[in-house]
Design a protein with these regions (language model features):
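Compact nucleic-acid interaction/catalytic patches
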Residues: 252-257
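N-terminal, charged low-complexity regulatory/assembly segments
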Residues: 1-92
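Hydrophobic, aromatic-lined core segments that form the binding pocket/scaffold
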Residues: 52-221
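Local cysteine-cluster metal-coordination motifs and their immediate loop/turn environment
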Residues: 226-251
Length: 257
């Protein structure tokens, strides 16, 4: 890569799609501009709980009679991952604020009803601040907050479950991008501060420490564990995941509870 790309203050001559290399080469970059793909879902629909439930019906049909909390949580994980990857790539490599508010983007779902891609009207605007409240306002205030409110309403799962899902992906992908040769170090510090700050904009930060580390007794391994369970164990098709805080608990009893 040209050295100029690494110099602070330099406008990187890269498109968003150009950044999908290395650990992200198997991900699909968002479509930007042009015609909206046939069948793509306007995300602003999800401000309406009934329409959100309608658009989740295909995914929910995979688990007939399944716990709504777990179904909504797993659906959200697909969605949050699909949104988080391009948002963080744009933040950390291009210093750009993608138009990922619910009113701006369209979501492309696969045949199972899971998010697999996005359509964006453009590739965003260049950031002029490292303030975490301002840098993440589009993602948090215009997308995650209203969507999580609706997901909680239709499923009965606590909002903190969905915030934990979202924060877990921020934690994972920011650590992946930290090793990228073109990462903007100031933007990286700001993103990590998002996960390390107890408050955000004067209020409790729902993304605070979504993943924690601990060393199991008698082991030299340092393990990363989610702060909150994603509830997937409530579906008969799943056990807990590898970084679940409930590992080792009586999950059958929890299901009955």
């Amino acid at each position: 890569m040209p050295l100029a790309l690494r110099q602070p203050g330099t406008v990187l001559p890269l498109s968003l799609a150009d950044c999908y290399q290395g650990p992200f080469e198997h991900f699909t970059p968002p479509l930007t501009g042009g015609a909206v793909p046939h069948g793509a879902i306007k995300a602003s629909r999800w401000r309406n709980a009934a329409l959100l439930e309608e658009d989740m019906a295909c995914y929910a049909s995979r688990y007939p009679g399944g716990d709504k909390r777990a179904i909504a949580s797993l659906w959200s994980k697909w969605h949050f991952s699909t949104v988080t990857v391009p948002t963080l790539i744009a933040h950390l490599l291009l210093n750009r604020d993608l138009p990922v508010g619910l009113d701006d983007l369209y979501v492309i779902q696969n045949e199972d009803g899971c998010a697999q891609g996005l359509w964006l009207p453009h590739e965003g605007e260049r950031f002029t601040t490292q303030d975490i409240t301002e840098r993440f306002a589009t993602l948090i205030e215009q997308h995650w907050a209203p969507l999580i409110e609706r997901l909680s309403a239709i499923s009965g799962a606590a909002p903190r479950v969905f915030w934990s899902n979202a924060g877990g992906y921020v934690d994972y992908y920011v650590n992946t991008l930290a090793a990228h040769p073109l990462v903007n170090q100031e933007a990286l510090a700001a993103t990590r501060a998002l996960l390390e700050s107890r408050t955000l904009n004067g209020q409790r930060n729902p993304l605070f420490e979504p993943v924690r580390t601990y060393q199991p007794s008698g082991s030299e391994e340092v393990k990363r564990v989610r702060k909150l369970c994603c509830l997937r164990y409530l579906l008969d098709e799943f056990d807990v995941c590898g970084n679940c805080p409930l590992e080792g608990c009586d999950r059958q009893a929890r299901r009955k509870g």
